Amino acid sequence: MSVGMAAPRAPYSCDPDRSRGRLVAEPPSRTRSPFRRDCDRVIHSTAFRRLKHKTQVFVFHEGDHYRTRLTHSLEVAQIARALARQLGLDEDLTETLALAHDLGHPPFGHAGERALNRCMEAHGGFDHNAQTLRIVTTFEQRYPDFDGLNLTWESLEGIVKHNGPLHEAVPSGIADFNARFDLELWSYASLEAQIAALSDDIAYDAHDIDDGLRAGLFTVDDLREVPLLEAMIGDIDRHYPGLVDLRRGAELVRELISYLIAAVAAESQRRIERAQPMSPHDVRRHAGPLVAFPADVAEHEATIKRFLWQRMYRHERVMRVMRDAERIVADLFGRYQADPASLPAGWLEGCDSEGDRARRIGHFIAGMTDRFALTEHHRLFDSTPDLR
């Protein structure tokens, strides 16, 4: 089959007509499948809109063209749908999981998550996947008959298990919900969820290269340190001699995305043909993931990640901003603990213990955008770092 062509629906895909349903039963939609309905609910949620002002690597006011969690999620969804189409899987469920995967991230990217996890260490820590589950099952308040978005079992399973089974140290937010609606934490997730997870990796690799080039943290020729990228750059230079770096970089990103999508599709098809799953049940009970990079491509992908770690994520300019961002999150947490009156009215209502209060404060901070966190810090402190 040609790359990009839609395969017939596979027997191991998740069939919306055979969904395991929702925690709160609802009448079916006259115009949309259950998974399309899930996707639309994510898109229309408040948490999804907030991703517009949440950091990937660069803080929101560093430039209008850098990725945010919103643009990243859209790019993950585009890649995931392409893979789902080639493998005969449900595109709507795949898109739902791609769009929802970052809903639980706090402000300031991984720096914000590290800081919030440290602040909450004595109270169970902070896990962004558990926070995503809380958002879609409790925190969104948009419907008269239920809290959250009341997503299907398949969407909730994919949100929780897209990176694999949860055997040990299950975050309390996930364990508590699982007691009400068993997501079979011990098993692998659907192929749709596995695709969403790999698509996240593909989008990160390609688009962090794009943002790093745009920020001047490295050049196209610096990327020749990565053997796979050196070969791609050589091909680009032969086909387009004298091309300016802006266009060389853009062409490299396109080539990389296409290469990784094709590699994942081919390897996943090989694994599926060996395993011969005949249903989503077979996929979940398989001994390992069925969506993956081939071994040689996985090595190339790891080399790209090492390059980005050394030249971008550990760059002093980025590190300085992230240190200041961690300080902002820690300052806010400490102030809200010491002075609950600085929180919005009613936010700690019903909290009977220090742990309850700490977790509620953590939820409040996790929901902030970068911009709101900075505004709050300005309101509560005499001096706020300039994240530039």
Curated annotation (Swiss-Prot):
**Cross-referenced InterPro entries, in alphabetical order?**
dGTPase (IPR006261), dGTPase-like (IPR050135), dNTPase_2 (IPR023023), HD/PDEase_dom (IPR003607), HD_domain (IPR006674), HDIG_dom (IPR006675), PHydrolase_assoc_dom (IPR026875)
Q: Name one GO molecular function term.
A: dGTPase activity
> Domain HD: where?
69-205
**UniProt record, GO biological process:** dGTP catabolic process
Q: Where is this region: Disordered?
A: 1-35
> Which keywords does this chain's UniProt record carry?
Hydrolase
**Domain of life according to the entry:** Bacteria
Give the family from UniProt: Belongs to the dGTPase family. Type 2 subfamily.
Which NCBIfam families would you find in this protein's record? dGTP_triPase, HDIG, PRK01286.1-1, PRK01286.1-3
Q: Which PANTHER family does this one have?
A: DEOXYGUANOSINETRIPHOSPHATE TRIPHOSPHOHYDROLASE-LIKE PROTEIN, DEOXYNUCLEOSIDE TRIPHOSPHATE TRIPHOSPHOHYDROLASE
Q: What is this protein called?
A: Deoxyguanosinetriphosphate triphosphohydrolase-like protein
Q: Tell me the lineage of the source organism.
A: Bacteria, Pseudomonadati, Pseudomonadota, Alphaproteobacteria, Hyphomicrobiales
